[in-house]
Amino acid sequence: MAKAVRCYCIYGLGGRWWSAGMEDVLAVNLRKIKGVICPPTFQYGHWQIIVEAIKNSPNDIHVVAAHSLGAVRATQITDYVKVDLLVLYDLAGGAPSKLGKNTGKCIDIYDTIPDLVPEWRVQAVKGHEKKIERWYSQHGHTGQDDSVPLMRRVEAEVMKLAA
């Protein structure tokens, strides 16, 4: 039997107000992929619920996609459990955890309009640097999660896991 792909999306600091695309663009399309389970998008402060959900399904494939401060919290999830694919939409609002053995692949979608805090780009512990793939966009911080072209790229990565 094929493993389920469990996708967890997380809003940024402004919740749905600033990150509606995490639900309205990304999550709704991930739910259309056969074999993907994607619950409603989480508030950034609820990241520990995702940790517990992953602990309760250790044999499944896990994807966490998050925007802004939610992306910071997404990196913290990997401090506790394994995440096969971590997608960070313009991480901001705090210093992320360094990625290591609990991270399969990380896509860091970095928006350059404007480049608010470049030192907050996600990093990996020594020996895990190649797990981070950097994508660049120019949608603005609050527009990145609404981008259909970016969503299609993320969707393609999830489809590989669901195949």
Please state what every model-predicted region is.
Residues 44-46, 90-94:
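Short beta->alpha connector loops
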Residues 26, 81-82, 102:
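Short, structured coil segments at secondary-structure junctions
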Residues 89-90, 109:
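Alpha/beta-hydrolase-fold catalytic nucleophile elbow
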Residues 76-84:
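Conserved hydrolase catalytic core segment
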Residues 2-60:
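Active-site catalytic motif of lipid deacylating hydrolases and related acyltransferases
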Residues 13, 98-163:
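C-terminal catalytic-base region of ester-bond hydrolases, centering on the histidine
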Residues 65-70, 74:
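Gly/Ala-rich beta-loop-alpha elbow adjacent to hydrolase catalytic centers
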